Regions:
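Residues forming the flavin
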Residues: 1-193
Length: 193
């Protein structure tokens, strides 16, 4: 998405996007708006009530819900993906393979907190069992972690968390009120096959 939005670089002409979250749909919309054909979005989830998948439906982008990519083909570059439907419990694939021609496969697994500097400074991590990522737990230094490095990814929640934690850290009582509008996003889902 950054290549096409910031630099105007098209990495492929026929794209398949594989995802477990709504953020990939923003990539699909960006590519579509720049003239790139989205062959399909392959989503392991059974559905999403987010705004971005709805927008992709409006644009006529094909969404394969509760599917996964099981194989790719190509020589020196990708030219095809094989897709299969997931079983009800997500433990296996079912039905026949669907083969989709493409010259680019985009993969979106969601967000992971950027904890590199935190751990380099001696900070300890904890694992979030619900969202499947490590995030800051404790540190011996006088520091705070907010936003994506703390596992907060919604813009509204990042601003609220930043204000609350900064005020606590600096012993401030003043609160600014911000009016933040963001699109509705569906949940992400992890899978282990």
């Amino acid at each position: 998405r950054k290549y096409i939005n910031y630099y105007g670089v098209k990495c492929g002409n026929n794209v398949v996007i594989f995802t477990n979250n709504d953020d990939a749909y923003e990539t699909a919309i960006s590519l579509h708006n720049k003239g790139v054909k989205i062959e399909a979005i392959v989503d392991i989830r059974s559905r999403s009530d987010g705004d971005l998948p709805k927008k992709c439906n409006e644009l006529g982008i094909k969404i394969l819900w509760k599917n996964t990519i099981v194989y790719t083909e190509g020589y020196k570059k990708i030219n095809k993906v094989h897709v299969m439907e997931l079983s009800n419990d997500n433990s296996s694939t079912i039905r026949n393979k669907l083969k989709i021609n493409c010259d680019l496969l985009c993969v979106s697994g969601g967000y992971t907190p950027a904890v590199h500097l935190f751990t380099q400074s001696g900070g300890k991590l904890t694992f979030n069992e619900e969202k499947y990522y490590f995030h800051p737990k404790s540190t011996s230094l006088s520091q705070i972690s907010v936003g994506s490095c703390n596992g907060t990814f919604s813009l509204k929640k990042i601003i609220e968390e930043t204000q609350t934690k900064t005020n606590e850290f600096l012993n401030l009582t003043h609160n600014n009120q911000y009016n933040i509008t963001e699109s509705k996003s569906g949940n992400f889902e992890n899978i282990w096959l």
